[in-house]
Amino acid sequence: MSRSLKKGPYVEGRLLERVEKMNAANEKRVLKTWSRSSTIFPQMVGHTIAVHEGRKHIPIYITEDMVGHKLGEFAPTRTYKGHAGSEKSSGLR
């Protein structure tokens, strides 16, 4: 279910302030954030935002295709290392 239109998209206020300040100063640096639920706005395009995934921050370069998505979609929280192999299948044939 999507968010109500009268509320508008969610973005952490401090994150948007920092991005707009960087746009005004025309500087590019990595912004750290824990706000995985923030929506990506057009002002963020071209910036690198390090999104927390539970252990560390994963740097994500924002492109135009990402606008409208959430930051957390691009920083997976679970690692899949594959199913355990059975000893029976590893024997000689």
Curated annotation (Swiss-Prot):
The keyword RNA-binding applies. GO terms for cellular component: cytoplasm; small ribosomal subunit. It comes from the Bacteria. GO terms for biological process: ribosomal small subunit assembly; translation. InterPro entries: Ribosomal_uS19, Ribosomal_uS19_bac-type, Ribosomal_uS19_SF. Gene3D superfamilies: 30s Ribosomal Protein S19, Chain A (3.30.860.10). One of its GO terms (molecular function) is rRNA binding. Transmembrane segments: none annotated. Keywords: Ribonucleoprotein, Ribosomal protein, RNA-binding, rRNA-binding. The keyword RNA-binding applies. Belongs to the universal ribosomal protein uS19 family. Protein S19 forms a complex with S13 that binds strongly to the 16S ribosomal RNA. This is Small ribosomal subunit protein uS19. The lineage of its organism: Bacteria, Bacillati, Bacillota, Clostridia, Eubacteriales.
